[in-house]
């Protein structure tokens, strides 16, 4: 889970399933909760992992600051899809049995950081 809070200006965009970007601007006192890959695996896809970006359209005259807060489960946490979520999504797990540490290591390798 990522909490996106305290942005000083517009620019938050969310990737939609058709590949287009949707403006996700908020008021200063609002928080955006961004679900990630681990929560998607744990819920067998009930909660979808989201992709976001931040663009600064008026880079010449303003700066945009934000304070993201990332939360990860402990390394030994079991990310096996929850049985109730598997039941609600057709009865078959869509994600492998793995720990949070194993998932994070694989992801970091995929993006060239491990």
Give names to the regions the model predicted.
Residues 1-114:
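C-terminal flanking tails of non-heme Fe-dependent oxygenases
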């Amino acid at each position: 889970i990522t909490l996106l809070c305290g942005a000083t200006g517009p620019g938050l965009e969310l990737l939609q399933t058709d590949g287009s970007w949707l403006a996700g601007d908020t008021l200063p006192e609002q928080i955006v909760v961004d679900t990630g890959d681990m929560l998607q695996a744990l819920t067998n896809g009930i909660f979808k992992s989201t992709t976001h970006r931040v663009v600064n359209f008026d880079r010449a005259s303003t700066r945009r600051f934000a304070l993201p807060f990332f939360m990860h489960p402990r390394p030994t946490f079991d990310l096996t899809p929850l049985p109730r979520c598997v039941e609600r999504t057709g009865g078959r797990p869509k994600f492998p049995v793995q720990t949070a540490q194993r998932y994070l290591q694989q992801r970091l390798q995929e993006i060239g950081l491990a």
